Amino acid sequence: MTIRYPNGHAYRAPAKKIGSQFSSTNTNYGKRGMTLEEELNESNTYYEVNGVAVVHKKPTPIRIVKVDYPKRSAAVIKEAYFSTASTTDYNGVYRGHYLDFDAKETRNTTSFPLQNFHQHQIDHMRACTTQGGICFAIIKFVTRQEIYLYRAQDLFTFWDAQQQGGRKSIPYATIAQDGIQIPAELQLPVPYLKAVDQLLS
């Protein structure tokens, strides 16, 4: 099936790397083959099953253009478009607070490129924070195997500076200093709600 962006360009999903099912005891993240999105989805399932929070990945709105019906009981989508630009990846409720956040990965070791975000995502997070929502980015430095919660307000500072000709990335050292590191736990690949607790305290 071909899925296209509103500008007509074909969507190509990033290749997934398959990690070894075995990990050494010194590794912080045992499930190395999992993407950040998969890790978050697993964590959110744990949170919901245990009555801790209700957080879901937002569906991406798609407009179907062409469908084939090889059998009466089966339809095959052959062509579709992203109908609108997506906002952030996840939203939900925790301890009476609205959460809205995006998940990003980078293989850079010294900085996080701001090009990973889009203006409509920043605008959406600004609107949510204005209404009292808790917005942030969960950033994974893949090579370092480190994950951080980075507040939207801090992200806005770098985004606005970039718009004025400033640097086009956030230094790793800044994220490590101002963000909240999220170490993996036995049952939770990304126990980010502990970091949210720090924002709420």
From Swiss-Prot:
Pfam families: RecU (PF03838)
Keyword terms of this UniProt record: Cytoplasm, DNA damage, DNA recombination, DNA repair, Endonuclease, Hydrolase, Magnesium, Metal-binding, Nuclease
Co-factor remark: Binds 1 Mg(2+) ion per subunit.
Coiled-coil ranges (or none): none
Keyword hit for RNA-binding: no
Enzyme class: hydrolase
Catalytic activity from the UniProt record: Endonucleolytic cleavage at a junction such as a reciprocal single-stranded crossover between two homologous DNA duplexes (Holliday junction)
InterPro entries assigned to the protein according to its UniProt record, in alphabetical order: Resolv_RecU (IPR004612), Restrct_endonuc-II-like (IPR011335), tRNA_endonuc-like_dom_sf (IPR011856)
Keyword rRNA-binding: no
GO cellular component entries: cytoplasm
SUPFAM superfamilies hit by this protein: Restriction endonuclease-like
Domain of life assignment: Bacteria
Positions contributing to Mg(2+) binding: T87, D89, D102, Q121
E.C. number: 3.1.21.10
Site (Transition state stabilizer): K104
Function according to Swiss-Prot or TrEMBL: Endonuclease that resolves Holliday junction intermediates in genetic recombination. Cleaves mobile four-strand junctions by introducing symmetrical nicks in paired strands. Promotes annealing of linear ssDNA with homologous dsDNA. Required for DNA repair, homologous recombination and chromosome segregation.
Homology family: Belongs to the RecU family.
Protein name in UniProt: Holliday junction resolvase RecU
